[in-house]
Structure formats: structure tokens, C-alpha cells
């Protein structure tokens, strides 16, 4: 294996591979991630001992790793030669699974695994096709837990906790340890039934250039203009002030044009997720309460006793409320005034590569799944030692946000199995899924994507030792904040269909002649129409039943969401980084 760079920070070096590249991080522990075990025949069977040696970073000791791997080898005997095909979205973690873990599992067990990678929109379409048609297309999906509202209603997804206790009792890893999964609550219904098993999760956080913010000259100029410190913004007004400052007051650093804000806005499906991934929640559209706000939760949908009753303000929803209009207007205003022109050609998957070029001061909506790209040897946002020049912090909040509301978004891509898949295929895929999330494997997988899923990994000394190299990600996952940065909730009854409406309407707003208010009124009406149609379809539970239409003031004058318009401008508030991390451990609930 070629190592493209070796830069020890504390005298010892650990290497991670991603996107076909190798980059180095230095820690005080000896950690090493090799490529899959090789032999003269790349498809030759592997022994348990071979595989144990591969996963040397595991939280388990050698004896415990051997025991897990022996169990997989034995449990797979009845399925040897079975071919299974699974699919997931395109992020570094899943590329690691597809390129390495699938092959190792095949060589260990004899189950032939094909792990496909595709774009998130395509993944959703394929899942929806199998769900709607009943045809067998894939044996397993790594599907966002944002779909939990769909899965609990349709009855088309295997309820994992029921199967683990019954049909799959003999093929469920004894050391699977469900309670060790940090995102397991995201995949349950109100009764505690588990529908999906987390495979990876990543948070949406605030990202900023700590080196630029620490520049004494910049600090002095910012304070002179705005009357408070250049530091980590706590609200949207401070974020906007900082964006204005770097875009127009600083303008250039080392002869290169720089920008105070960064975003992505290409007119394609990921544009919808840019808003639907809790952007409205950060503005303060929701009600108080966790995980998503009660009774008004994500997407401004009101649900009463789990029954969706409306998205429009006239039905008690908040999708077209003053807070939602404010959120959408800020997105467009910042994009057009403070972001580089290239932003409008970028997507969820391409944005991180641009950010790594080093021309941006901050990003309010940054996905931690792309840490590997920012740490790549070609990145311009690391120093000569490979340490990040950036830091992560809690997301700034809009002027409607109140203590007790949801604080941010977290994606939890989770193993999902459909009843329409033949039993043998489903069972073999279940074995592979458990391998990818087993304690033997997960820490090495973490090092190849930085999307942790287990308490035992994030609380380990090895993860703690990575603090300096990850710019705040360790602090986030070791704090209570990981529990309140939540995915979309159960209020959303048909995620795939309704998600498609988002990007089409947001695209029209960005690139057409329509206001934020008009956009959200149209979208809220579409949501209500769709939920009305769903009410005629038999569902297992929580079928929509829309409220009667009332005058908007009826709901706006009631306590809670939808909130009345706030005319007053926020005063910008910032905090030094040393104080920011404390916020992740206090008052998060």
C-alpha cells in the first residue's frame, strides 16, 4: 500500500483511506488502517485470524474479535454461495463498505455481497419502486432514518426488533448490542419498535476558519464596525455580520478573493435537502420538544397524537408561517450576497471539494460526512502538519428559535429491509449488515468516514485522541448534543414523495420570479393535498387526517407554532470557542 503522506503530530501516525486516497492524522495511540487482507488469489477465503488482524483498531480485544468473527463464519454456513445486493448513498463511509467490507465479508463467509453506491435521490427512487411495486430489487438498503414516518405507516419494512426476537433470533449477532447505537432512538416508533439499524450518522454543524477568526487585525476591524467580538456566531444575525465582514471588508487574503458564506444551490434533488434537513427548525419554525418539536415538527407539519393534520398555517401547520418565510429568505439572501458564484453550480456531493480550496470564511450548513475531503493532502484548509485550520461549533439559530427546540440536524443512514425481499436473500443481507456495524468493524469504519454509530467507539481513548485532528467533531459526539441534533421525524408520512416537492419548489424560488412567501404557500398547499390523498389509503398507524381550514390568525394567536411574525432585528451574539463546546453539554434538552 502506498502512503501518499506521513505527518506525525504527536510522534505517532495513523493512516486513513478514503476516495481511493490515503491521508494521515497523528495521534498519541498507534492506530493503523490497512487495505483488505491480500493473498495470491484476491477472492480466496480468509480465516478468522486474517480478518481479526485487519481490524486492529476495534474496541474489542483479539479474543472478542475472534469470537464475533467465528460467529459470522458459522452463522453464514447455511447461506454460503448466496448472492446478495445492497445499496447506499455515495459518501466516504459507504465507499469503504463497498470497496473493502463487502469483499472481506465475502471472503470470510462465502456469501457473495455486491454493495452498490449511488446518489441519494436515485437510492430513494429505487427504494420507493420496490415498496410501491412489491418487486424484489435489492436485498437491503441503507436508507436515512428520515423515512421513519413512512416506514411506521406502510407496513412494508421489516420491524427489526420483532424479527430479532423471533424469525432472526438465530442469525442475530449475540454482541450486536442495540443499546450501544447512538442513533437507535431515531429509528423507532412511539411504542419502541425498531425499524432500521443505524450504519452511519453525520451531523450538520457550523464550520469556520479558526485561523482567520483568530487574526488580531480582523478581530480589531470587526469589533470597530459591529461592537462585539469576531468569534463563533450564536445567532443568524451574527452569522450575517461575519459574512458581510469577510465578503466586503476583508475581500482578499494572500491576494485571493474570499467569501464570508458558503452554500450549495444547483437546481437538482439535493437542493431540497438543503432546506428540508432541519433548516426551518434552525430558524425556529417548530414547536418546543424533542426529537422534532410537538405538535409542530419538521417541515412545519402539525401532528396530533402522531396523526398529521396539516402543513399550512390555516390548518395549524407552520410551513408557510412567518418563521418559515424568514428562513427561506435568509437562505437566498446569503447565497446571492455573500457566497462565491460557484455555489449555484454545486450540490451536496460537490460542495465539500470547493470548500477545501480555502476561499471561504464560514459555512452555517456543513455536513460532517465530508471531513475526509477537508483533510485530504490536496486540501488547502489544513496546515503543514495536517491539522485543520477550521473548527466546528453548534449551528447558529434564527430569531424564532427558543430554548427547548431542536438544535440541529443529524443524518442516520440505517439498514432497512423490505418484506418483499425473499427470506433467504433478506437473511443473508442481514448478516452482512450486522458485520458492517459490528464492534469488530466500526472503529476502523469510523476512521474511513468519520460517521460514528457506537457509544463504545466515541467514548474510547482512541477517539478522544483524535480531537486535535478533527476540529471539534470528537467534542460533538462525546457531548449530549448528539442526542438533540436529530433527523426528520415521524410527522412526515411519505418522505420520498414529499421530499421531491421540496427541491422543485426551492429551485423555482431561487431561479424563477416568485417570492419566498408564494413558494411556501404553494408547497404547503401541495403537502396538504398529498396528505389528504394519503388519508384515503389504509395505513398501519398514524394516517393523516387534516384539520378544517381556519383563518390564519386563529393559529397565529395561539401559543406555540405557528409563531407570530417577529419584526425586530436580532442583535448579533458571538462566543469564543473555549465557551462554545460547553454549550453542547448544558441545556441541550
Give residue spans per PLM region.
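Glycine-centered hinge/linker elements that transmit conformational signals in sensory
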Residues: 238-244, 281-345, 395
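Extracytoplasmic/periplasmic substrate-recognition and gating elements
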Residues: 188, 192, 212, 336-342, ...
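Hinge/lid segment of periplasmic solute-binding proteins
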Residues: 43-78, 145-205, 389-395, 566-589
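Short, polar/charged alpha-helical segment
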Residues: 69-75, 92-112, 207, 211, ...
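Extracytoplasmic "Venus flytrap"
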Residues: 61, 66, 81-100, 202
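Periplasmic solute-binding protein
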Residues: 145-165, 181-228, 240, 263-312, ...
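Long, aromatic- and glycine/proline-rich binding clefts that accommodate carbohydrate-like moieties
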Residues: 69-71, 83, 387-397, 409, ...
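Extracytoplasmic "Venus flytrap"/periplasmic binding protein-like
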Residues: 103-180, 215-217, 221-223, 354, ...
Amino acid at each position: 500500500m502506498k502512503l501518499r503522506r506521513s505527518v506525525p503530530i504527536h510522534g505517532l501516525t495513523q493512516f486513513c483511506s478514503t476516495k481511493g486516497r490515503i491521508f494521515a492524522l497523528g495521534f498519541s495511540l498507534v492506530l493503523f488502517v490497512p487495505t483488505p487482507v491480500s493473498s495470491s488469489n484476491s477472492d480466496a477465503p480468509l480465516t478468522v485470524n486474517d480478518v481479526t488482524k485487519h481490524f486492529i483498531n476495534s474496541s474489542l480485544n483479539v479474543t472478542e474479535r475472534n469470537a464475533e468473527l467465528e460467529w459470522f463464519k458459522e452463522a453464514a454456513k447455511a447461506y454460503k454461495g448466496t448472492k446478495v445486493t445492497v445499496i447506499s448513498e455515495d459518501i466516504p463511509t459507504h465507499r469503504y463498505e463497498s470497496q473493502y467490507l463487502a469483499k472481506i465479508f465475502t471472503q470470510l463467509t462465502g456469501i457473495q455481497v455486491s454493495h452498490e453506491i449511488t446518489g441519494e435521490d436515485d437510492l430513494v427512487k429505487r427504494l420507493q419502486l420496490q415498496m410501491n411495486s412489491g418487486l424484489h430489487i435489492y436485498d437491503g438498503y441503507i436508507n436515512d432514518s428520515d423515512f421513519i414516518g413512512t416506514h411506521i405507516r406502510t407496513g412494508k419494512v421489516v420491524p427489526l426488533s420483532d424479527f430479532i426476537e423471533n424469525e432472526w433470533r438465530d442469525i442475530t449477532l449475540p454482541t450486536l448490542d442495540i443499546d450501544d447505537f447512538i442513533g437507535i432512538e431515531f429509528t423507532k416508533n412511539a411504542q419502541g419498535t425498531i425499524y432500521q439499524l443505524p450504519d452511519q450518522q453525520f451531523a450538520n454543524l457550523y464550520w469556520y476558519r479558526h485561523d482567520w477568526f483568530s487574526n488580531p487585525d480582523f478581530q480589531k476591524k470587526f469589533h470597530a464596525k459591529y461592537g462585539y467580538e469576531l468569534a463563533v456566531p450564536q445567532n443568524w444575525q451574527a452569522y450575517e455580520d461575519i459574512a458581510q465582514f469577510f465578503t466586503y471588508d476583508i475581500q482578499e487574503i494572500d491576494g485571493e478573493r474570499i467569501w464570508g458564506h458558503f452554500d450549495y444551490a444547483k437546481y437538482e434533488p439535493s437542493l431540497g435537502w438543503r432546506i428540508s434537513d432541519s433548516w426551518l427548525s434552525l430558524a425556529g419554525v417548530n414547536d418546543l420538544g424533542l426529537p422534532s418539536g410537538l405538535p409542530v415538527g419538521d417541515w412545519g407539519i402539525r401532528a396530533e397524537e402522531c396523526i398529521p393534520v396539516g402543513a399550512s398555517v390555516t390548518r395549524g401547520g407552520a410551513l408557510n408561517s412567518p418563521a418559515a418565510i424568514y428562513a427561506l429568505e435568509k437562505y437566498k439572501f446569503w447565497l446571492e450576497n455573500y457566497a462565491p458564484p460557484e455555489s449555484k453550480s454545486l450540490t451536496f456531493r460537490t460542495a465539500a471539494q470547493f470548500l477545501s480550496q480555502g476561499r471561504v470564511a464560514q459555512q452555517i450548513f456543513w455536513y460532517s460526512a465530508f471531513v475526509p475531503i477537508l483533510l485530504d493532502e490536496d486540501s488547502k484548509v489544513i496546515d503543514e502538519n495536517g491539522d485543520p485550520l477550521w473548527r466546528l461549533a453548534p449551528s447558529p439559530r434564527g430569531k424564532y428559535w427558543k430554548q427547548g427546540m431542536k438544535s440541529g440536524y443529524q443524518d442516520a443512514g440505517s439498514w432497512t429491509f423490505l418484506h418483499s425481499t425473499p427470506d433467504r436473500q433478506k437473511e443473508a443481507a442481514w448478516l452482512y449488515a450486522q458485520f458492517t456495524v459490528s464492534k469488530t468493524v466500526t472503529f476502523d469504519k469510523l476512521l474511513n468516514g468519520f460517521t460514528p454509530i457506537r457509544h463504545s467507539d466515541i467514548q474510547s481513548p482512541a477517539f478522544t485522541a483524535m480531537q486535535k485532528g478533527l476540529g471539534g467533531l470528537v467534542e460533538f459526539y462525546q457531548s449530549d448534543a448528539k442526542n438533540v441534533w436529530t433527523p426528520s421525524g415521524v410527522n412526515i408520512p411519505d418522505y420520498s414523495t414529499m421530499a421531491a416537492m421540496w427541491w422543485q419548489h426551492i429551485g423555482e424560488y431561487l431561479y424563477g420570479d416568485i417570492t419566498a412567501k408564494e413558494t411556501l404557500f404553494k408547497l404547503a398547499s401541495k403537502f396538504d393535498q398529498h396528505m389528504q390523498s394519503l388519508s384515503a389509503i389504509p395505513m398501519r398507524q398514524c394516517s393523516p387526517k387534516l384539520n378544517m381550514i381556519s383563518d390564519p390568525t386563529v393559529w397565529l394567536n395561539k401559543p406555540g407554532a405557528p409563531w407570530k411574525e417577529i419584526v425586530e432585528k436580532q442583535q448579533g451574539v458571538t462566543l469564543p470557542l473555549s465557551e462554545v463546546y460547553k454549550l453542547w453539554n448544558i441545556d441541550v434538552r
